[in-house]
Amino acid sequence: MIKIPSPGGYDKLVYTDLAEDRYTESANIKLENIKEEDLVVVKTYACGVNYADVCTRWGLYESAKKFVGWPITPGFEFSGEIESKGENVTNFKIGQKVFGVSIFGAYSKRIRVPKHQVFPLPENFDTHEAAGFLTVALTAWYGMFELARPRAGSWILVHSAAGGVGSMLVQLAKIHGCNVVGVVGASHKVDLVKQIGCHHVIDKSMEDLWKAAESHSPGGYQVVFDANGVDTLQESYDHLAPGGRLVVYGFHTMLPRSSDTSNGVISWWQWIKIGWNYKNTPQFNPLKMTTENKSVMAFNLSFLFNRRDILEESMAQLLYWVKRGLLKVGKVTPYPFKEVSKAHSDLESGQTVGKLVLTMDY
């Protein structure tokens, strides 16, 4: 397993051999006093790497502090096979291939989670695709259908459209019959975003983002999905149509890229920059929002895993689309488990496309 003893750089991603009878746990087992009979132990084949894992390593992820503290094993998603199960678990067999979510703990060769957080592996997924699917898919589903609730024909702007969550948002919007404009930060990402369903793609490295956005939907957007933070939040809000909704699920541009750090360590100068960005993050006035008939919504998926009603509803829809080939993971880049530092560094660079996963060396 990978354990982070304290906040810091890549050297804090400490690999530790896990004995055959040991496992990590999803944090909600103890938080919710979930019974032993309702738990499963999964031998993992792969686990997904998300930007939240990087923030956890830096000590900037609030739910990590609230639910676990230090030391912590990061990770929210995995694929593998059922190794053991409680007596109340009747919907899975020993050895059955599954994928699932956890509240931390997924960077491990063996993890114990509640049965409602594990699902049968779809036939059209391999274990790498499955390990990189759930966190981004659930994030996109919640933002799209629980918060934004667009109507067919709505105009939707998706920042970071080539990323894990962004590519899922594009596909969900397409399934729902919306007009999708995707934003990417580099030319090599344009073709991918077109392939997954964007009607228009804005390459902000080659053209003015907001002039292009206005040309595609002069009347504004019914929904804008923004995980950038201070760099784009105000303009995202300003480009909403009346009745529009800005959905925020991250603040990537507030944080340094790997090229700005030394071995993944945030320098004193970068901490000052983070503080400056925090201070200059737009503040949305409720009176102005009411006058302009616009909304701003934000969420953090790790606080939602205990909502079984949402998990069941979202997974039913997501798996329905997966089985019919309407929803795909896209590009998945695997890294050997012990190369977790490289995976973090590459993700921090902002140059990756799709999802990164760590694979076990059985």
Predicted regions and their residues:
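C-terminal hydrophobic helical "lid"/dimerization subdomain
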Residues: 4, 305-362
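Glycine-rich beta-strand-centered segment in the early N-terminal region that forms part
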Residues: 30-49, 61-105, 227
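NAD(P)H dinucleotide-binding glycine-rich loop of Rossmann-like/cofactor-binding domains
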Residues: 55, 67-71, 76, 97-162, ...
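Mid-domain Rossmann-like dinucleotide-binding core that forms the NAD(H)/NADP(H) cofactor-binding site
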Residues: 133-207, 211-212
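A short acidic, Gly/Pro-enriched loop at the edge of an enzyme's catalytic core
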Residues: 214-223
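Glycine-rich phosphate-binding loop and adjacent beta-alpha segment
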Residues: 231-324, 362
